[in-house]
Design a protein with these regions (language model features):
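Active-site phosphate-binding strand-loop segment of PLP-dependent enzymes
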Residues: 4
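Beta/alpha (TIM)-barrel catalytic core signal, keyed to glycine-rich beta->alpha loops juxtaposed to Asp/Glu
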Residues: 8-202
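Disulfide-rich extracellular domains of secreted proteins
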Residues: 196, 212-213
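Substrate/cofactor-recognition hotspot
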Residues: 207
Length: 213
C-alpha cells in the first residue's frame, strides 16, 4: 500500500506514541510505503507532525477554514509533511449552488449533522452556521470572474498556498469532476482578490470558527 492514513482518530491518539510505533512496524515490514493521518483540529496536525514517520496530514482547509495556514502550514513545510486538503468547498457551500431552500437527503450529513449531532460539527459546512455562510458566499460571488465557476475559484484559492500538496474535492457526477479539475488551470488569484477574501473571512467567519478547529 502506497499510503495508509488514520482517519480522524480521537485527539488522545496523537499523544500515544505506541499508535505511531505500530505504523512504523507496518512500514518496516513492507506492508505500507508511507503513513499519515486525517485530522479534525490544528492541534492534532501539529502533534502528528512531531512523529518522524508521518508523511502526510489530511486537513480541512478552505476560504471558511483558514486557521491551518497560520501555524500548521509553516511547520509542515519545514518538516516536509505533505498536506492533503479535504472539504475545499466546505461541504458544497463554496460551489455557490446551495441556497436557503436547498433540501438535502435524509442520509446526507448536511441534513443530519448540521449542528454536530452525529460527529464533529466542523465536518459539515466547516462548522459555519448556514445562514452566516450563505451571506458570506454572496459576498464571495461578487469577486468571482464571470467566466469562472465559484467552485473552481474556491479551489484555486486553496492551491494558491504552496504548502498544499493535493486537494480532495467531492463530486457526485462526471461534470463536477471536470469542473473541479479546471481549478488547476486557472491563473493565480490577484492580491486584491486574496485580500478581499481574507476580509470576508475575518469579518464574517473567523469569530465563529477560528479557535475551534
Amino acid at each position: 500500500m502506497d499510503l495508509l492514513q488514520l482517519h480522524c482518530p480521537p485527539t488522545e491518539a496523537y499523544y500515544r506514541p505506541e499508535v505511531f510505533d505500530a505504523l512504523d512496524e507496518l512500514k518496516q515490514a513492507g506492508k505500507i510505503q508511507h503513513y499519515g493521518v486525517s485530522v479534525e483540529k490544528v492541534e492534532e496536525a501539529l502533534k502528528a507532525s512531531e512523529y518522524p514517520g508521518v508523511a502526510t496530514v489530511q486537513i480541512i482547509f478552505n476560504i471558511f477554514r483558514q486557521r491551518p495556514k497560520e501555524l500548521f502550514f509553516p511547520l509542515a513545510q519545514k518538516r516536509d509533511v505533505g498536506i492533503l486538503v479535504r472539504l475545499p468547498l466546505a461541504s458544497g457551500l463554496l460551489g455557490g449552488k446551495i441556497t436557503r431552500n436547498t433540501q438535502f437527503a435524509a442520509d446526507d450529513h448536511r441534513s443530519y449533522n448540521r449542528y454536530g449531532e452525529r460527529f464533529d460539527r466542523g465536518e459539515t459546512f466547516s462548522g459555519v452556521d448556514l445562514d452566516v455562510a450563505l451571506d458570506a458566499v454572496e459576498q464571495i460571488r461578487r469577486i468571482v470572474p464571470a467566466d469562472v465557476s465559484m467552485a473552481a475559484f474556491a479551489m484555486r484559492w486553496v492551491l494558491q498556498h504552496e504548502e498544499v500538496s493535493c486537494v480532495i474535492p467531492g463530486a457526485r457526477n462526471a461534470d463536477q469532476v471536470i469542473e473541479n479539475a479546471k481549478a488547476s488551470d486557472l491563473a493565480p488569484l490577484s492580491s486584491e482578490q486574496m485580500q478581499m477574501l481574507t476580509k470576508i473571512y475575518q469579518d464574517e467567519i473567523r469569530p465563529l470558527v477560528h479557535q475551534r478547529w
